[in-house]
A protein has these predicted regions:
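Active-site-adjacent loops and short helices of periplasmic peptidoglycan-processing enzymes
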Residues: 1-51, 57-64, 68
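Domain-terminus/edge residues, biased toward the C-terminal soluble/receptor-binding domains
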Residues: 30-31, 44-200
Length: 200
C-alpha cells in the first residue's frame, strides 16, 4: 500500500516521494531523521528518533482525515464489482480497542515492527483537555503497551495545561521555584504551556 501511495503522490516515482518525505521532515525541524523508503522497512540509512517521530506524528495529527483513520476501531469495506463479500479492516492499536490493553482517552496511533527495530508504537491520548503523544522504540510485543501506558500515566499525573498569557504585551513566567529561573515572554495572542507540579 505504501509503495502504491508513494508512486501516486510521487508522480510515478517512489524515490521522488521519499525525497518529499525527507524534505517535509526537515521542514518540521527533524534533525535526526532520514528516510530511504515509504514503508519503514529496514535500511541502514533509514532512521529516526523518538523526538523526531513525535514531531512528525503531531504534524500529521493536524489533519482531520488522519485523526479519523487512526481513531477508527474497525472499518467494513463494502462489496464491490470485484469482491462479493464485505471485508473487515481492524485497527492494530490495542490501546484504542476494548480489552486489557485499552487506555482511557486514547485517540489512536500507529504500530510498527521489524526484526531489526523491534516493536514501535506512536500513540495519542487526551485527558482534561490536554493531549499527549507517546513514542516507544525498540520495545517488545509484551511491553510496548504497558510502557506507553506508564508514560501516559506519568504525563497526565504530573503535568497540566496552563495559559500563561492572553492578550498581554508581556508576562513573567517562573519556570523553577524560589526564583531560581524566570522568563519574560511576549505573545501576540495567547500561549499555553505544560507545567510540572506547582512550578509556574
Amino acid at each position: 500500500v505504501s509503495n502504491g501511495v508513494a508512486e501516486y503522490v510521487g508522480g510515478g516515482s517512489i524515490s521522488a516521494f521519499v525525497d518529499k518525505m525527507n524534505e517535509r521532515a526537515a521542514s518540521l525541524g527533524c534533525t535526526n531523521t532520514h528516510f530511504m523508503n515509504p514503508s519503514g522497512l529496514h535500511d541502514d540509512n533509514h532512521y529516526t528518533t523518538a523526538r523526531d517521530l513525535a514531531t512528525i506524528a503531531c504534524s500529521a495529527f493536524q489533519n482531520k482525515i488522519f485523526r479519523k483513520i487512526i481513531g477508527t476501531e474497525y472499518y467494513i469495506e463494502p462489496k464491490t464489482n470485484i469482491t462479493d463479500e464485505e471485508r473487515w479492516l481492524n485497527n492494530h492499536n490495542k490501546m484504542l480497542l476494548s480489552g486489557e490493553k485499552h487506555y482511557d482517552g486514547c485517540l489512536g496511533g500507529k504500530t510498527g515492527y521489524t526484526t531489526t527495530a523491534g516493536n514501535t508504537l506512536v500513540t495519542f491520548a487526551e485527558r482534561d483537555n490536554m493531549r499527549l503523544v507517546c513514542v516507544v522504540l525498540a520495545d517488545t510485543l509484551r511491553f510496548q503497551y504497558s510502557d506507553t501506558a506508564s508514560l501516559f500515566d506519568y504525563g497526565f499525573g504530573n503535568f497540566h495545561k496552563e495559559v500563561i498569557t492572553e492578550n498581554q504585551p508581556e508576562t513573567t513566567v517562573q519556570l523553577l521555584p524560589a526564583d531560581a529561573l524566570s522568563l519574560n515572554v511576549t505573545t501576540p495572542e495567547f500561549l499555553s504551556c505544560v507545567e510540572k507540579g506547582n512550578c509556574v
